């Protein structure tokens, strides 16, 4: 069992975030991967009269696994973003940005994989307090946000990670 509140030294220092990442990567997501594979086999073996229900259940498992991956990506992003804010070495800062771009690509792949599942079952992504935060409209919106981050925001930010500024430093009066 995983009890995050029981991790010795977990405090505002950031250790908890790393413990969460370790648990997601080594325990939680692999367990969901195994569960999805078992459910795929169950769908194949399901009698015709239960196949539709079994397929919906498989979709729920796959959708939730995608949400776990999003959680992992968000936690990794948070850590890299904080490191980037305080990094004074341009080479290391650019390496951090490369890692951030990898996370964007992983999350875009994750979202694209779950869109057909959400389109097939409109109940997925609905949460009573937040409405359809995981519905297809929001999934496409998320892809647009990730593309903008990759193609615009991070590219402009990367230009600031150099002693050779790509624009004039002279001030106009």
Protein language model features and the residues they cover:
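Substrate-binding groove of N-acetylhexosamine-processing glycoside hydrolases
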Residues: 1-173
